[in-house]
Amino acid sequence: MDVADPQPLGLFPEGELMSVGMDTFIHRIDSTEVIYQPRRKRAKLIGKYLMGDLLGEGSYGKVKEVLDSETLCRRAVKILKKKKLRRIPNGEANVKKEIQLLRRLRHRNVIQLVDVLYNEEKQKMYMVMEYCVCGMQEMLDSVPEKRFPVCQAHGYFRQLIDGLEYLHSQGIVHKDIKPGNLLLTTNGTLKISDLGVAEALHPFAVDDTCRTSQGSPAFQPPEIANGLDTFSGFKVDIWSAGVTLYNITTGLYPFEGDNIYKLFENIGRGDFTIPCDCAPPLSDLLRGMLEYEPAKRFSIRQIRQHSWFRKKHPLAEALVPIPPSPDTKDRWRSMTVVPYLEDLHGRAEEEEDEDLFDIEDGIIYTQDFTVPGQVLEEEVGQNGQSHSLPKAVCVNGTEPQLSSKVKPEGRPGAANPARKVCSSNKIRRLSACKQQ
């Protein structure tokens, strides 16, 4: 009998079964031949937004991709937990300040706040913002040189100055300009983000004097490194923009140190060198923006009039492309909400269960991004007309402005037909959007 030929167990005598070997009737397979079925992604709705995958995570919270189910616009949501914010110095105050600042800013080079939602039960806040495909720091880290070609750096720097000039015109000092806070859209538009440590000057302030700073150490000017009590806020942003320009054109930093004390000591002295391969006009601009004395430091007007800023630079090197997604290695950065959208529609047609997807209850929808808990009354103008100030238009979905939805008690399911109707409406709305 050939051992290689499988035989029924009953044909082997009891004493010969072990000598034949287990390989006779159990076929070994290689692990590469096993196909693992990935876990099905479960759709989750936060208000009208369908949640996607994680885009990034910082000290304040996570950032995920979302899809607006009404407009089909691709958005990003910053998820903030109140419990986590309490552990960060000035965490809650910084978030509240950022919302108050972003709600009144409208510029193509400043990130736009689209919506704010708050879950009182879970103590979570959702800041919905326009979607940016990549960050400048991520692009720099994707190439060995850690820098951009001069032509590409020039285009980004011009947009940075445009956005910075707008912020200063609104009386806002950013205080933390750096590549990590500069985002990019698919068409290369730069967006200044993260206004958590920014400061809004008083409308009747005589100058731009500031007294506090919480920016990144490597981008701070000498006046802050030396511990001055007061300093010019706008000149702080000019210095940080100069360090950013130095970094994206050389791949280096003008000041470095083994620790923050050594770093501030080097910044406080103000001595730095510029690589010899930098063109003279660029070197002159960098020295003007990184001037030790704030009074002699370039203003935005002087930057705009500089020859390097006004010059059209030829494309001498290949541009740095947007890198593939770090998790999925997707070079096109496709929408991560698609699997959740497919799961939502597919299961909606097959099943009549309420648990098709997760729905966050207790959401406070805010209009014009009113900070949760803030109550504003109508303001009457001099002409007698009332101007409605921002206020929450829906608390737990019970206000008449939106479709009524009373939060039920108990587990959703067949015992709660009202919830089933509400969920079906959401599914039909998303299905209609998909067909369009």
Swiss-Prot record:
Pfam families: Pkinase. This is Serine/threonine-protein kinase STK11. The gene is Stk11. Residues 45-90 are annotated as: Sufficient for interaction with SIRT1. It catalyses: L-seryl-[protein] + ATP = O-phospho-L-seryl-[protein] + ADP + H(+); L-threonyl-[protein] + ATP = O-phospho-L-threonyl-[protein] + ADP + H(+). The modification Phosphoserine is found at S31, S325, S403, S431. Tumor suppressor serine/threonine-protein kinase that controls the activity of AMP-activated protein kinase (AMPK) family members, thereby playing a role in various processes such as cell metabolism, cell polarity, apoptosis and DNA damage response. Acts by phosphorylating the T-loop of AMPK family proteins, thus promoting their activity: phosphorylates PRKAA1, PRKAA2, BRSK1, BRSK2, MARK1, MARK2, MARK3, MARK4, NUAK1, NUAK2, SIK1, SIK2, SIK3 and SNRK but not MELK. Also phosphorylates non-AMPK family proteins such as STRADA, PTEN and possibly p53/TP53. One of its GO terms (biological process) is negative regulation of cold-induced thermogenesis. One of its GO terms (cellular component) is nucleus. SUPFAM superfamilies: Protein kinase-like (PK-like). Keywords: Acetylation, Apoptosis, ATP-binding, Autophagy, Cell cycle, Cytoplasm, Differentiation, DNA damage, Kinase, Lipoprotein, Magnesium, Manganese, Membrane, Metal-binding, Methylation, Mitochondrion, Nucleotide-binding, Nucleus, Palmitate, Phosphoprotein, Prenylation, Serine/threonine-protein kinase, Spermatogenesis, Transferase, Tumor suppressor. Phosphorylated by ATM at Thr-366 following ionizing radiation (IR). Phosphorylation at Ser-431 by RPS6KA1 and/or some PKA is required to inhibit cell growth. Phosphorylation at Ser-431 is also required during neuronal polarization to mediate phosphorylation of BRSK1 and BRSK2. UV radiation -induced phosphorylation at Thr-366 mediates CDKN1A degradation. It comes from Rattus norvegicus (Rat). Signal peptide: none annotated.
